[in-house]
Amino acid sequence: MNNGRIVRINGPLVVADNMKNAQMYEVVEVGEPRLIGEITRIEGDRAFIQVYEDTSGIKPNEPVYRTGAPLSIELGPGLIGKIFDGLQRPLDSIKELTKSPFIARGIKVPSVDRKTKWHFIPKVKKGDKIEGGDIIGIVNETPLVEHRILVPPYVHGTLKEIVAEGDYTVEDPIAVVDMNGDEVPIRLMQRWPVRIPRPFREKLEPTEPLLTGTRVLDTIFPIAKGGTAAIPGPFGSGKTVTLQSLAKWSAAKIVIYVGCGERGNEMTDELRQFPSLKDPWTGRPLLERTILVANTSNMPVAAREASIYVGITMAEYFRDQGYDTLLVADSTSRWAEALRDLGGRMEEMPAEEGFPSYLPSRLAEYYERAGRVKTVGKPERFGSVTVASAVSPPGGDFTEPVTSQTLRFVKVFWPLDVSLAQARHYPAINWLQGFSAYVDLVANWWNTNVDPKWREMRDMMVRTLIREDELRQIVRLVGPESLAEKDKLVLETARLIKEAFLKQNAYDDIDAFSSPQKQARVMRLIYLFNTHASRLVERGIPTKKIVDSMGQLLPEIIRSKAAIKNDELNKYDELERKLISVFENLEKEAGT
């Protein structure tokens, strides 16, 4: 394979000639330090290479070494609990090797530890017919994750050999497949190109909600397992904290957190918190189900794109094992800015605000890899990849290209409002601008498993919030006294919804995570208040009298979110009894 020669260097873009027969997206090693790069354009025998490491110090005429392979990652036991850079190099291994807090250029470190032995339990026997995606055995990687060893998608045939139960490294052959006369070894580890989606048998409709423990996300704008969501918001509106809450408390089996071009201290927060936090679904440390990809703002710009693809490829791998995975990306705007930077250096025709014209297709490729699927292989299983991405529009302008294009491809929109954040209303998700296309799909699950009136109660809350916004303009002009009594009740109910339900403290031990049952109990109290109070208002009782009769009951309902634990829901029975008792007394008064 002929090596190329550098002719031009422009930041992360390197142009090399003598690259005849090179392939698009082929990985090359650039210059004497052998920096990792990827071919993004070919003109004759000249290749344009985006380099994923700092190019300072390399010179024209230095060699470019071809590998003949696309950018691929290693998939196997040893991924869980690790933190990787944007090229899937484990940061702890780099630190041990270099004895430095910085990543040395051109360093080569295996993504999956070659020395660790894993206890392999075979699930197939010699002579079995196997195909791509079949589970041939398991490795208990962590107490939370049973790592299912899959036949690579392109392998099929008769199982000629399979090892006995025992301890093996990721490079040891554990099986041999007779594939049309060729003997193909299977190891615990496999490689997969990051830009190619992993195959599946069938894409399914997402009908089960991905529970997050955040009330506004679960109830007002729910996301389904296999769904796509965007969280746009200006600086300081709470994007990172919202995404961290998602990563901490979501009911996903595997969480992959990609820090793409954001500040390094945010990744540090994750690493400090996750080992000490317990998964509310299993009681185990959160790091036992989490993979972190750190491609922070001070790392090379070009590697931001790689980090996004690395994250979603790992998510697809665990999906193929039959797991529900969540990919959290913070933030896709930084990736888009990297595309803009590289597009400018390659002298491409810019589109709106300087972003490349292919930005929508790149975003579409990324979001289309989400979904709930029936996987290939035996036994039959179902898995999902849910994608939640932050978008960082400058100045909170949602009409800028990255936000507006993202809106075309996502089904859930969680817009963060800086005015809510300034008013200390967190999560600062604007209930008027947001939307979810999954409400109808997940309503049946909520009605069946949590509360048969869930949809009715949710719709009442949404209607009340919309009506309150309409009334706010009138209140500003003439004051609340001029409103009809039923409209005064709308304002009171909306206040209760916001204070008791929508506001949530991500740093409170009790309030940080609300179980579906607890959410339904709080909704039920608000629903009862609104229903009974509406009847009394129709009978001529003023809203002020109803609120005054409540005494300390409404503040008690508001405080309950941080006072009543998820396993103490019987305490809501007492609040319900008190609420109904107040209304019964008011109805007796109204009847006389």
UniProtKB/Swiss-Prot annotation:
Catalyzed reactions: ATP + H2O + 4 H(+)(in) = ADP + phosphate + 5 H(+)(out)
Main location: membrane
Name under which the protein is recorded: A-type ATP synthase subunit A
Cellular component, GO, one term: proton-transporting two-sector ATPase complex, catalytic domain
Binding residues for ATP: G233, P234, F235, G236, S237, G238, K239, T240
Protein topology in the membrane: Peripheral membrane protein
Organism annotation: Saccharolobus islandicus (strain Y.N.15.51 / Yellowstone #2)
Entry keyword set: ATP synthesis, ATP-binding, Cell membrane, Hydrogen ion transport, Ion transport, Membrane, Nucleotide-binding, Translocase, Transport
Native organism taxonomy: Archaea, Thermoproteota, Thermoprotei, Sulfolobales, Sulfolobaceae
Gene: atpA
Function as written in the Swiss-Prot or TrEMBL entry: Component of the A-type ATP synthase that produces ATP from ADP in the presence of a proton gradient across the membrane. The A chain is the catalytic subunit.
Alphabetical list of SUPFAM superfamilies matching this protein: C-terminal domain of alpha and beta subunits of F1 ATP synthase, N-terminal domain of alpha and beta subunits of F1 ATP synthase, P-loop containing nucleoside triphosphate hydrolases
Alphabetical list of CDD domains matching this protein: ATP-synt_V_A-type_alpha_C, ATP-synt_V_A-type_alpha_N, V_A-ATPase_A
